[in-house]
A protein has these predicted regions:
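N-terminal signal peptide
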Residues: 2-4, 10-33
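Extended, non-transmembrane interaction/recognition domains
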Residues: 47, 51, 55-358
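C-terminal single-pass transmembrane alpha-helix
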Residues: 349-406
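Extracellular/luminal recognition modules and glycoprotein regions
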Residues: 22-43, 355-362
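N-terminal hydrophobic or amphipathic segments with adjacent small-residue motifs
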Residues: 8, 15, 367-371
Length: 406
């Protein structure tokens, strides 16, 4: 079989597999917990055929997300008074979850990139400012939900750290979206989501910088709390893509996987992942011309796990039990050499996916397959027509020679 034929078979198999691999859809249910319009807490459950994904978001204290996979009948109970005080086990499920993962926006870090490297230099602490995420004042801007998707938009317009007397103006916008089918998100960078994942889009807009810093850049530290093996580090795995159809100019997806762990038989089992494309946009247009790079740093284990989650919603669920689970941080900084620093546009974005289970793999779209097919098929058609022309011309010449020989 020729190489061209093999490629055509591969393209045909890709189209068939995309049509057969229908995702399992979930049904969304919004439940009001602790009815108080001033609260910045939201709860959703997404029911599948055999299990339920619970989502809790809280922006009081450190902004945090809890995802829990449970059996279908499992319900959530929040003791509102205790939860407001961030007390131990104020969040309880009626049955033990199959798996949980918590994400905390732990810190917003401003660093003075005096050497224009776009990398944080921890050796010089004078060039680093840590903004506590719990000192931002958040408000809910909008919440939308339909049969197979939801959207929550939060915004913080003021920073006030009472312990240090530091205040900052500017806006941090957080958009959380879930789509319960396999598809790319509708906004750039068009991340691939599944029915078991959600998207987080963060925007740092006109954040007031340190007056003594001439070359300010920003970084975000996430803290991950996971039921996996606490002794293993999370895995950071950059993956190359075949094309940049969904995110122009970007041929890579950075993937962070948690080390799944089943204590009963000590086998790797449940796990979660984060995914993002290594690009940050410097304007609302989110075009290639207004983009810069993202730098990811190795994960770090958190030593005092209880203290780390104390001022977040996650303490209300894990409590003292957090000592026995994985708690690690990852740091992401924004910018590249000679991009003008944060002050060039005073606008920076970061978009990432949080998901349960196996991360989805990018597939060639119908458009790309069509273009490849045309690119491969056209030369074959030309070769066939040329061969047919040569054959007809040769047969015609033979017929003429035979006639003359008579």
């Amino acid at each position: 079989m020729s190489q061209v034929s093999l490629i055509y078979l591969f393209l045909l198999f890709s189209i068939i597999s995309m049509n057969l691999a229908g995702p399992i859809k979930r049904t969304l249910h919004y439940e009001e917990k602790c009815n108080n319009t001033n609260w910045t807490t939201m709860y959703l459950r997404a029911d599948g055929l055999n299990n339920t994904l619970h989502y809790i978001w809280d922006f009081g204290g450190k902004p945090s997300i809890l995802m829990a996979l449970t059996s279908l009948p499992t319900t959530l109970n929040i003791t509102c008074e205790d939860f407001a005080l961030k007390k131990n086990h104020s969040i309880v499920f009626s049955d033990n979850p199959i798996y949980t993962i918590g994400i905390v926006i732990n810190k917003i870090i401003e660093f003075n990139d005096v050497n224009n490297t776009a990398v944080i230099n921890y050796a010089n602490t004078k060039n680093i400012n840590v903004l506590k995420s719990e000192s931002f004042v958040w408000s809910r801007k909008s919440f939308t939900m339909n049969g197979d998707s939801f959207g929550l938009n939060m915004e913080a317009n003021f920073y006030n750290d009472t312990t240090t007397n530091i205040t900052r103006r500017g806006s941090i916008k957080a958009s959380l979206k879930g789509y319960y089918f396999l598809e790319h998100t509708d906004s750039i960078p068009h991340m691939l989501h599944t029915e078991n994942s959600m998207l987080v889009d963060l925007i740092l807009d006109k954040i007031e910088t340190n007056e003594t810093f001439s070359s300010s850049r920003f970084a975000i530290e996430l803290m991950i709390v996971d039921g996996g093996n606490p002794d293993k580090l999370m895995i950071i795995d950059p993956k190359k893509n075949l094309d940049d159809e969904h995110t122009p100019g970007i041929f890579e997806v950075v993937e962070v996987r948690t080390p799944g762990f089943n204590r009963s038989n000590e086998t790797q089992q449940n796990c979660a992942y984060l995914q993002w494309r290594p690009v940050s946009y410097l304007s609302t247009s989110r075009s290639i011309s207004s983009s810069t790079e993202i730098v990811q740093y190795p994960p770090f284990k958190v030593n005092d796990r209880v203290a780390a989650i104390k001022n977040s919603m996650l303490y209300g669920y894990y409590g003292q039990d957090v000592k026995d689970v994985l708690v690690q941080t990852i740091l992401i900084s924004f910018g590249s050499k000679d991009d003008g620093f944060y002050k060039s546009t005073n606008y920076t974005t970061w978009t990432f996916i949080i998901g349960y289970g196996t991360p989805p793999d990018e597939q060639l779209s119908y458009l790309v397959i069509l273009i490849i097919s045309i690119g491969l098929g056209l030369p074959v058609v030309i070769m066939f027509l040329a061969a047919l022309y040569a054959y007809i011309r040769n047969m015609s010449k033979r017929h003429t020679d035979t006639y003359l020989n008579r």
